[in-house]
Amino acid sequence: MSAASIAAALIAALEAAAAREAGGPCALASVNVEMLAAPATGEARVKTERKTRTMMFLSAEYLTAAGERIATAASVHKVIAP
């Protein structure tokens, strides 16, 4: 598992969570990924921090099976009107 694949997994998880939470498509406006440890196999967990009618703010963590935090991410998404 490389740092690039961890970043890609975090971004994919953030985009999927934003679309699911909004009930439709969203555009990724910005994302910040921070690597905190050496790359390892794990999974992304996403949390919605704030949601308005037109914008969503999410955060994510990439954790190993043992619970070690490998990376974090924060993103802003524009909700696209149906």
Residue spans for each PLM region:
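Terminal targeting signals and extreme-terminal segments of soluble enzymes
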Residues: 1-82
